[in-house]
Amino acid sequence: MTLYRFISNNILFKFDPEFIHDCMQVILSNKFAPYLTSLYSTSNKHISKTYIMGQELNSPLALAAGFDKNCAILKALDKLGFGYIVGGTVTINPRPGNLKPRITRYVDNNSMVNSLGFPNLGVEKIIENLSNYDLKTPLIMSISGDSISDITELYKLLSDYCFGFEINISSPNTEKLKYFHDYNNFENLIKSLNDIKSKPYMIKLPRFGISTLDQKSKSIYEKYFQILSDNNVDGLVLSNTFPVEDSILKVGQGGLS
């Protein structure tokens, strides 16, 4: 048994998962945390460099959105050797997210289900946090909203703080995002982003289909892909978590990772 497995099984997994995550956020926000995380950094000299949206990366391994929703611990994460980090997901106004409990573990399957619903401090506070950093690791900002105007405003406000964007219309825990699952609304969003484009962006699509990718799901994806191709979108993220029901969660459902 590894040290991590011993600690997680015997200590961390005894507590609520969101509580543990919040505790780690506090620890990693300490001014000494970057020195601690640098001890666990590995050299990338044997890892193939790659590119994403024109940006050279020292590693193809990245930290996905959701770990540092408020960009509060980027200094510590910057030392871990990721090819890039995705901050957020950020919304225009602060959001509390869904009611708790909103994360549960499936320890036997090495998996978890979350129904967070984009809890974050809002773009104003996150810009304040971002202003404190001079990162070596390339940063992508994940943004989302209930309307095209929300998303385009976030794009403009955050463009000075990252090399690109991940447009998140994929969360299974945010009901209003289904507005963008309509093909016309989706394409209007893309066109609106292209009208103000100053940085590259990629679209994060939701999971379609059940356990297998049936013909109906393939047709849905093909339609989205065609829209992305026709409008010269820089990248695509596939896909968000798998929607499941779980009575432990306050809202009764979430996304399986």
Report the location of each language-model feature.
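Non-cysteine beta-strand/loop elements that form the S-adenosyl-L-methionine
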Residues: 86-98, 162-170, 234-242
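N-terminal capping/small domains of soluble enzymes
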Residues: 2-138
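Active-site beta-loop-alpha junctions enriched in small/polar residues
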Residues: 66-68, 90, 144-146, 170-172, ...
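Alpha-helix-loop-beta-strand connector modules within alpha/beta enzyme cores
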Residues: 111-114, 120-137, 182-202, 253-257
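Active-site-adjacent beta->alpha loops and helix N-cap segments on the catalytic face
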Residues: 94-101, 123-127, 173-198, 212, ...
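Active-site glycine- and acidic-residue-rich loops that bind
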Residues: 140-153, 178-186, 200-229
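Glycine/Thr-rich beta-alpha phosphate-binding loop at enzyme active sites
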Residues: 25, 29-43, 115, 172-185, ...
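Hydrophobic faces of well-ordered beta-strands that scaffold small-molecule active sites
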Residues: 61-65, 85-87, 114, 139-143, ...
